[in-house]
Curated annotation (Swiss-Prot):
Pathway: Amino-acid biosynthesis; L-cysteine biosynthesis; L-cysteine from L-serine: step 2/2
Organism from which the protein derives: Bacillus subtilis (strain 168)
Database matches in PANTHER family: CYSTATHIONINE BETA-SYNTHASE
The protein, known as: Probable cysteine synthase
EC number: 2.5.1.47
Cofactor: pyridoxal 5'-phosphate
Modified residues (N6-(pyridoxal phosphate)lysine): 45
Disulphide-bonded residues: none
A GO biological process held by the record: cysteine biosynthetic process from serine
Cytoplasm listed as a keyword: no
Family: Belongs to the cysteine synthase/cystathionine beta-synthase family.
Keywords: Amino-acid biosynthesis, Cysteine biosynthesis, Pyridoxal phosphate, Transferase
InterPro entries assigned: Cys_synth, Cys_Synth/Cystath_Beta-Synth, CysK, P-phosphate_BS, TrpB-like_PALP, TrpB-like_PALP_sf
GO molecular function: cysteine synthase activity; L-cysteine desulfhydrase activity
Length: 311
């Protein structure tokens, strides 16, 4: 059916689920990937960005002429830049200088100003700089995705109900939900709501083996962009997940490449990591169950990285 909408915000959500075929393990639960690159700016973060802006407007924190400032690893910033452009706000996004060229250029394409901070400072450095800018710029507002309850709320309101409707259509019980974690918004909001709807499911959070902060380890370098900011975000509900799955850069990269070459699904490395974890989770469940895995963004944002250096 042809979809005609009033603005880009109406295109956020209702992303499709696609079944794994060639990567599907035998005698295991069926894995479905929820393709968040179908959102208008290409990632799951469109959901949180829109919800944070709407709630800020409702609470009088954003008014005509306001400036949105946000520390971001990229996807939330892109979602905020898109929504800011559509709603008439200026956006300033602060990010580590290790982020991909594609992300930086996308932000600029949406009319946003980009401020880069030293990569070795990771997200805490970008957060500090964003707060400094907010003190200097009048009528500015930091949504602060790591603290903002609108972030998980977006997934309670949209992502989880979408998955529930899909499970009803598939006709098999949901056995597990798998997602990576950056801010914690997706795993918290979706996980909480799905456990209310499907009390018997397990929730599995993915983090990079090189920066196992959720597992109690120290932050470190890794290639799963958008995950493990180097600290445990305040909005993350650590009780919602039943298992933390640590994924190596190598396994994430291999799975990401296989998804493109064998399934025709081009996603980013954090999605490859989540898919690897979903496949391993599915092997522990019976074939009459379903595993839903969130894929955070499009792989087009990573074509300049070593993920695709062999091309």
């Amino acid at each position: 059916m042809l979809k005609i909408v009033a603005n880009t915000a109406d295109l956020i959500g209702d992303t499709p689920l696609v079944r794994l075929n060639r990567l599907q393990p035998e005698n295991a639960a069926q894995v479905y990937l929820k393709l968040e690159f179908f959102n208008p700016s290409g990632s799951v973060k469109d959901r949180a960005a829109y919800q944070m802006i709407i709630e800020a407007e409702q609470n009088g924190l954003l008014k005509p002429g306001s400036v949105i400032i946000e520390p971001t690893s990229g996807n939330t910033g892109i979602g905020l830049a898109m929504n800011a452009a559509a709603r008439g706000y200026k956006a300033i996004l602060v990010m580590p200088d290790t982020m991909t060229k594609e992300r930086i250029n996308l932000l600029k394409a949406y009319g946003a100003e980009v401020v880069l901070t030293p990569g070795e400072e990771r997200m805490p450095g970008s957060i500090k700089k964003a707060k400094e800018l907010a003190e200097q710029i009048p009528n500015s507002y930091i949504p602060m995705q790591f603290d903002n309850t609108a972030n998980p709320d977006a997934h309670r309101k949209t992502t989880a109900p979408e998955i529930a409707r899909a499970i009803e259509e598939i006709g098999k019980p949901l056995g597990a939900f798998v997602a990576s974690s950056g801010t914690g918004g997706t795993i918290t909001g979706t996980g909480e709501a799905l456990k209310e709807l499907f009390p018997d499911i397990t929730v599995h959070v993915v983090e990079p083996a090189g920066s196992p902060v959720l597992s109690g380890g120290k932050p470190g370098a890794h290639k799963l962009v958008g995950t493990s900011p180097g600290f445990i975000p305040p909005i993350l509900n650590e009780d919602v997940y039943d298992e933390i799955i640590k994924i190596s850069d190598e396994d994430a990269y291999t799975t990401t490449r296989r998804l493109a070459a064998e399934e025709g699904i081009l996603v980013g490395p954090s999605s490859g990591a989540a898919c690897f974890a979903a496949i391993e989770t599915a092997k522990r469940l019976s074939p009459d169950k379903v595993v839903v895995c969130m894929t955070a963004d499009t792989g087009e944002r990573y074509l300049s990285t070593d993920l695709w250096s062999f091309i």
